[in-house]
Amino acid sequence: CKNFKDAVEDDPLIKEIIFLDRYTKKFIHIFKLSKILKKYKFDNIIIYYPSVRLYLAARLANIDHISIYPLFRKKGLHLVNAAKKLTEKFLNIENCPTETEYFIKKSDLNNSIKNVNSDYFKIVIGAGSSGPTTRWGAKNFSNLINKLNTNGKYFFYILCGPNEKKIEDEIVSNLNKDNFLRLSDKSLKEVIPFLCTSNLYIGNDSFGSHITAQSGIKSLVILLDSPKSYTDYSKNHHRIIPKGYNISKITHGSNISPDLIKVEDVYSLVKNFEKN
């Protein structure tokens, strides 16, 4: 959430972002949060979470129109469908689109590619993620990159967070060519232009795949421990799951072995998407 401001800084439709990082955990915080909400004199509030605390805080803040998911129904909540339905009701529209237009300055986009040969096919390697059970693994990524480098012209953006430098180091130390750029030492605002000018995303379910998908870029997302609903909203998401698994059954706690997704299979998918 703290990075959201950087992610949408260039969007002309967003006037202001107010980040509330306190008073959202305990029941007693309802009263403190309501005072903050009341200060802004909101006419409407839309809450994309079935939170009793937020609902009561909004009521105490005398906000006239409160839109929220059905309370006490968190289990089985489909993130995309629930958000879509709530937005349609709030805006009084039908069939709210789930694809969006991602805004970024043209100068930032141009700067991100000025040192990359225009003949190269640029691939984001999304090696980082929210937790170890969702990761395909550094070894698999380095093997994939090396295999691709034997048959094509590529440039790779190694996408890992600042706390995932060890993963990045492990990938880079096993590469046979120097056609890559590390992104772990860059801020989110610095990273985004590289993602938006790439040709393909390959990696774990992470923020990078959402940025690329919403930039109209094909995104191959490896699902090992994430619900399919996380990637249901975009036509640019293409899920990779182990053979024999039902995608609807994969969710938090599945703990599927990353080695069940073979490098050769991912390589074949990349070559196919490269042609198309």
Residue ranges and their predicted role:
Residues 1-276:
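Catalytic machinery of carbohydrate-active enzymes
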